[in-house]
A protein has these predicted regions:
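Active-site metal-binding loops of divalent metal-dependent hydrolases
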Residues: 19-20, 154, 266
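Conserved phosphate/ATP/ADP-binding segment of small-molecule kinases
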Residues: 156-247
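Conserved post-catalytic alpha-helical subdomain immediately downstream of the catalytic base
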Residues: 228-229, 253-311
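Short acidic, glycine-rich surface-loop motifs adjacent to enzyme active sites
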Residues: 145-158
Length: 311
């Protein structure tokens, strides 16, 4: 396999738009059960915040050597401030919209004991119509200055009007990669690539009986949405790509699966950088598959660097 195209990636300008969240981790030790209820008591020893959702996609893009601009909606709160600070530290260009209507920035707090997740607490609230309008207006101003658009949909509200974003990007000559959510796939019509996982694909086309059945359903969906390509991420079964040239598959490369959270973000980021660097869909899938195999061996939402991919 050829080396990762780092020199070409450095010139790539990728715009990431979607649902932004903060992943907060509390690490500790468990050595007793609470006398108040039959639950473990975690003695917190370390705290860590990481970029999540679309922000994790942008962070992975930068780690792979490309330029990333992050656009989405955050609240005027502590979690939103942390996202801005962490993005700056990672080298992500900031095009965030701050919702001053009282919106809570999406925050996922995980409590871990002995490297095992014991509890997750979510704080989330959708953006206001005014914030979404500002997001749309800002998007129209900057999308044409980028080589590729990535849409990271976690169904938190930032991509409520995703159809207009895709249309504007294609009119500007910008390719669009989408990580979808839900079963309303007609929202993504006109995108270049959609990357459902196995469960999301079942939501979109129903259960399949054989690989031949899946191929028929996948190609029908690709034609219906006018996609160049459809890529299904299938966990331990690898990845399968569908284009006008047919079906192509790569087997999974993970040696040990430790944590799958954020793995889809890394896969999407790698696909985006590889495509922006001039690689074809199949080559991009091979690199994304390798990146996915690396990141699931790490704890929590993590990144994969170009150096890791090339070794």
């Amino acid at each position: 396999m050829n080396a990762f195209p780092l020199s070409a990636a450095r010139a790539a300008r990728i715009l990431v738009v979607g649902d932004i969240m903060l992943d907060r981790y509390w690490f500790g030790e468990v050595d007793r059960i609470s006398p108040e209820a039959p639950v473990p008591v975690v003695r917190v020893a370390r705290r860590e915040d990481r970029l999540g959702g679309a922000a994790n996609v942008a962070r992975n893009i930068v780690a792979l050597g490309a330029q990333a601009t992050l656009m989405g909606v955050i609240g005027a709160d502590e979690a939103g401030s942390r996202i801005k600070a962490l993005g700056a530290e990672a080298g992500v260009n900031d095009a965030l919209v701050i919702d001053t209507s009282g919106m809570d920035t999406t925050l996922k707090m995980r409590v871990l004991g002995r490297q095992q997740q014991l509890l997750r607490v979510d704080f989330e609230q959708g953006p206001s119509p005014q914030a979404l309008q500002r997001l749309h207006d800002n998007f129209l101003e900057i999308v044409g200055a980028h080589d590729l658009l990535v849409l990271s949909d976690y169904a938190k509200g930032a991509l409520t009007h995703v159809e207009t974003l895709i249309q504007a990007a294609r009119q500007a000559g910008v390719s669009v990669l989408v990580d979808p959510k839900g079963h309303r796939y007609k929202r993504y019509v006109g995108a270049s690539l959609v990357t459902p996982n196995r469960s999301e694909m079942q939501d979109a086309v129903g259960r399949w009986d054989t690989e031949g059945d899946l191929t028929q359903r996948a190609q029908a969906l690709r034609h219906e949405l006018s996609l160049e390509a459809l890529l299904i991420t299938r966990s331990e079964q690898g990845m399968t790509l569908y284009t006008q040239h047919g079906r192509q598959h790569v087997d999974a490369q993970a040696h040990e699966v430790f944590d799958v959270s954020g793995a889809g973000d890394t896969v999407l980021a790698t696909l985006a950088v590889a495509r922006a660097a001039g690689l074809g869909w199949y080559e991009a899938m091979v690199w994304a598959n390798r990146a996915g195999g690396i990141v699931v061996g790490k704890l929590g939402t993590s990144i994969v660097t170009s150096q890791e991919l090339s070794t």
